[in-house]
Curated annotation (Swiss-Prot):
Protein name: Large ribosomal subunit protein bL25
GO MF, any single term: 5S rRNA binding
Function: This is one of the proteins that binds to the 5S RNA in the ribosome where it forms part of the central protuberance.
Family the entry assigns: Belongs to the bacterial ribosomal protein bL25 family. CTC subfamily.
Keywords on record: Ribonucleoprotein, Ribosomal protein, RNA-binding, rRNA-binding
Organism: Bartonella bacilliformis (strain ATCC 35685 / KC583 / Herrer 020/F12,63)
Length: 205
């Protein structure tokens, strides 16, 4: 889990496109805090700090503490909007959380030992079906990533969720099927390895 961080925020007295543009000109981003059965709270947060948090990775899986005057609110970033041309953050949604909160998060998948995987060493290609897995997790123990070790996978193998050891308290949202996360596909022209081996065996008889 990434280390929690603190952002200073201010309550927005005005909302709307005009006030949002003015905030951005002054180095801030409009944002909203919602959840925990409380009314939404319109705030502004520093542009520069949020920009680096978003593009540094782990933004939506890391708890933040928003300091608004003397009040401190624990939140989890749930969504953000980027400028379609310049990739600048335009707006952020924060969810109120506590140590007991269970949240829905999309956790990125990281593949380990790709260079030593038997299937890839033989020319196979890692075909990633899911770059993220939607899970429920304790708000204070969200993993930065779900790690999958490829060192035992060969060409033709599929990696299903049942083969992945998830951290304690983390549960995939999809429960009705053993979904595929990735496969080791044969390179073009190689064909099915098991079929070729059977044909060779038949020829020797």
């Amino acid at each position: 889990m990434s280390k929690s961080y603190t952002l200073k925020a201010e309550v927005r007295e005005r909302v709307g496109k005009g006030s949002s543009r003015e905030l951005r000109r002054n180095g801030f981003i409009p944002a909203v805090i919602y959840g925990d059965k409380q009314p939404p709270l319109a705030i502004s947060v520093p542009y520069k700090e949020v920009f680096y948090k978003i593009h540094g990775g782990g933004f939506r899986t890391t708890i933040a503490t928003l300091e608004i005057g003397k009040e401190k609110i624990q939140v989890l970033p749930k969504d953000y909007q980027l400028d379609p041309v310049r990739d600048f953050p335009m707006h952020v949604d924060f969810l109120r959380v506590s140590a007991k909160s269970i949240v829905h998060v999309n956790i990125p998948v990281h593949f380990l030992n790709e260079d030593t995987a038997p299937g890839i060493k033989r020319g196979g290609v890692l075909n990633i079906v899911r770059h993220e897995i939607e899970c429920t997790a304790p708000a204070n123990a969200i993993p930065d990533a779900i790690q999958i070790d490829l060192s035992s996978y060969s060409i033709g193998d599929s990696i299903h969720i049942s083969a992945v050891q998830l951290p304690e308290g983390v549960t995939p949202v999809i429960q009705d099927r053993n979904f595929t996360i990735a496969t080791i596909a044969a390179p073009a022209g190689m064909g099915d390895t098991s079929e070729e081996e059977n044909n060779e065996s038949d020829a020797k008889k």
